[in-house]
């Protein structure tokens, strides 16, 4: 909030958009923009896909956010441990892409905010733990 207020004072109409490292910061920026009469006029994006951010997107005050899907992240940890413990697979024999991998995030904008809200906030998402690698988007690469 304080940073955005300072930027609005210093840069005024030169601010064409605000990227925030998380939704909480993005929402604070929106609060400052509201006080300046510019909420919804300056695009603000965040990361996390929290309820208040999705609601701000629905109101047109926030341009977007990325949800990293905490249900899936937590579930993956449990599903992998469960499958290893019950003998579904042997982690020592799994390829490297099943040890260090990226998950697929969800980009939330005005186009899909209501659908995301309905399926991930208003209710719990449907996840398929029989296919634990189905949402993996690739192996982490190191240079």
Protein language model regions, located:
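A residue-level marker of the well-folded mature domains of exported/periplasmic proteins
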Residues: 1-143
């Amino acid at each position: 909030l304080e940073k955005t207020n300072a930027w609005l004072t210093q840069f005024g109409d030169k601010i064409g958009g605000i990227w925030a490292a998380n939704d909480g910061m993005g929402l604070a920026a929106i609060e400052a923009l509201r006080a300046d009469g510019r909420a919804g006029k300056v695009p603000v994006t965040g990361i996390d896909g929290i309820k208040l951010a999705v609601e701000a997107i629905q109101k047109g005050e926030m341009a977007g956010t990325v949800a990293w899907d905490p249900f899936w992240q937590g579930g993956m940890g449990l599903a992998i441990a469960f499958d290893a413990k019950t003998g579904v697979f042997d982690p020592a024999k799994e390829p490297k892409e099943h040890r260090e991998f990226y998950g697929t995030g969800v980009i939330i904008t005005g186009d899909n905010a209501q659908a995301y809200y309905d399926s991930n906030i208003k209710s719990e998402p449907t996840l398929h733990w029989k296919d634990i690698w189905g949402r993996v988007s690739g192996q982490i690469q190191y240079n």
